[in-house]
């Protein structure tokens, strides 16, 4: 089975590509070639935003799965439909759990929760993309599967709520130095974190699965924590008291 990963070097996609390779998938990464290619994977260097260049490099190629990790809005997926309509049996789009209705009308949030987020443009763009893909599936049978991750982290990007221009690790540095950190609200709101390795197991299970075509899934852990608990866990791992 062959898979084309558009991107493939981010927090989520790195873990998915590694696990897919371990499971026997022939993985090709399509990106601008700015990072080393992991062992066992093929590389195609192109900018996905250059449709003509990607069309040329795709000549004579087909894939069981096209895994799109960097598409943002409607224009991105419209381009992908043109590029991959005849090139794949399954197109998996990474959306976002932030697309779900805000404020939430009830819990738990499921895949059937309405997609309405007036507060964040990123989420609205993801919703726009989902609508285009769903319409293409219903009208032309475009083989889309939609995946909505929540807050995903790994060893290179620890889970924090708010950080400055120096990134997530700056928050851990502040905890180490005993400096105060900002926790959302009163710290009691619930949040779901998912390690990228756990996300990858769910994602790879959808790859090549015909029952996933035309459906949407969120992949998250099964544990919710308050933001106070999350930051207390970080401080405990650093063997420092939390100053918040």
Residue ranges and their predicted role:
Residues 107-111, 115-131, 151, 161-169, ...:
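Short-chain dehydrogenase/reductase
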Residues 61-108, 117, 124-135:
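NAD(P)-cofactor binding segment of oxidoreductase domains
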Residues 163-171, 184-207, 214-215, 229-232:
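Substrate-positioning beta->alpha
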Residues 131-160:
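Conserved beta-loop-beta element that borders a ligand/cofactor-binding pocket
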Residues 7, 154, 183-189, 217-224, ...:
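Glycine-rich Rossmann NAD(P)(H)-binding loop
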Residues 3-23:
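N-terminal Rossmann NAD(P)H-binding glycine-rich loop of SDR-like oxidoreductase domains
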């Amino acid at each position: 089975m062959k898979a084309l990963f558009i991107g493939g070097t981010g927090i989520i996609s790195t873990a998915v590509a590694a696990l897919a390779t371990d499971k026997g998938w022939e993985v090709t990464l399509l990106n601008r070639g700015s990072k080393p290619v992991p062992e066992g994977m093929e590389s195609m260097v192109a900018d996905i935003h250059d449709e003509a260049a990607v069309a040329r490099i795709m000549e004579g190629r087909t894939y069981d799965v096209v895994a799109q990790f960097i598409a943002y809005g409607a224009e991105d997926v419209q381009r992908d439909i043109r590029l991959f309509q005849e090139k794949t049996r399954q197109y998996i789009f990474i959306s976002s759990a932030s697309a779900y209705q805000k404020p939430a009308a009830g819990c738990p949030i499921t895949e059937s929760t309405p997609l309405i987020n007036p507060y964040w443009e990123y989420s609205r763009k993801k919703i726009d993309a989902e609508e285009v893909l769903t319409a293409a599936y219903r009208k032309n049978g475009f083989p889309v599967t939609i995946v909505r991750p929540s807050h995903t982290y790994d060893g290179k990007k620890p889970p924090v709520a708010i950080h400055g221009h120096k990134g997530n690790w700056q928050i851990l540095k502040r905890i180490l130095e005993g400096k105060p950190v900002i926790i959302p609200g009163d710290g009691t709101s619930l949040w779901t974190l998912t390690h990228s390795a756990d996300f990858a197991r769910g994602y790879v299970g959808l790859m090549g699965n015909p029952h996933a075509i035309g459906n949407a899934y969120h992949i998250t852990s099964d544990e919710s924590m308050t933001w106070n608990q999350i930051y207390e866990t970080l401080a405990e791992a650093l063997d420092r008291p939390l100053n918040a």
